[in-house]
Amino acid sequence: MKKSKYVLLALLVSLGLFSCKKDFVPTDSATVNMNGEWWVAIFVDDSIMIADYSDIGGSIITTNTAANTSSTMMIDDQNNIWPFKVQVPVDYPNLTFSASTGHLNLADSVNTIDVIDGSRIIKDGATSPSLHTTDSIVLKMEFSDDPGTIYWFKGYKDTGWPEDRWD
């Protein structure tokens, strides 16, 4: 009986020690307000839709880089569209993608991508199919394997609601 009291006491002490562990609080990335999963339609020269959300069957991801700076981001279509994956400069306070040229397409390591002026994220600028207010994105890009054609990727940020997803 005495032994079981000591075992019970040891168990209670160990539970007390481990229950005092603080909860993990993750830190935000340097580009947290621009990060996300985006459902986009694709236009040529802002007027001709060449692919709707349902045609693509996937999303674009914007995320910070390993350097975690507020001046550079990754844009990745997850092989759903072109395919492309590119690191681009951003103006984080204004939520814009800086106009810049010659970014290596990391998806194929051959072609380059130009980001055209006017690419941006608009806070609460869209209404999703489930009628939730969410951010919108406009990306204007030119690909070196299709020179002279400006592709506009326009859409909304994923809300987490199943009816807003197109995959």
Please tell me what each predicted stretch does:
Residues 4, 21-25:
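Regulatory, intrinsically disordered low-complexity regions in eukaryotic nuclear proteins
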Residues 1-7:
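Bacterial N-terminal signal peptides that target proteins for export
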Residues 27-167:
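First exposed extracellular module after export/assembly in secreted or surface-exposed proteins
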